[in-house]
Amino acid sequence: MLRHKEPYVLYRKLLGFYPTDIHLYEQACLHRSSSICEQGRRINNERLEFLGDAILDAIVADILFHKFKTSKEGFLTNTRAKIVKRESLNEIAVKLGLDNFITYSMRTSSHNNY
């Protein structure tokens, strides 16, 4: 397989390593508005986003659980919700430059959900 150098270099710069499966990273950056059809299935980032959200929730929950050892469940839940809310994640994505990786359709009126 011939590797296209540019995406690998960009991901290396952002992540600190070269991705093993570049197609998985490309799919993660494919907004629903730019879905492609493959074997009768619409391919985009939604399933990977679901998985990533679940993993992020678990990681943040673990960090908060260990950092705030005497805090009640309500505090931990509210704090986690504030950290992983869409607006916070969008702001982080822009600061990291992830918005430059997202492929979306120009027809979409709002594309700030990375």
Named regions from a protein language model:
Residues 1-114:
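RNase III-family endoribonuclease catalytic core
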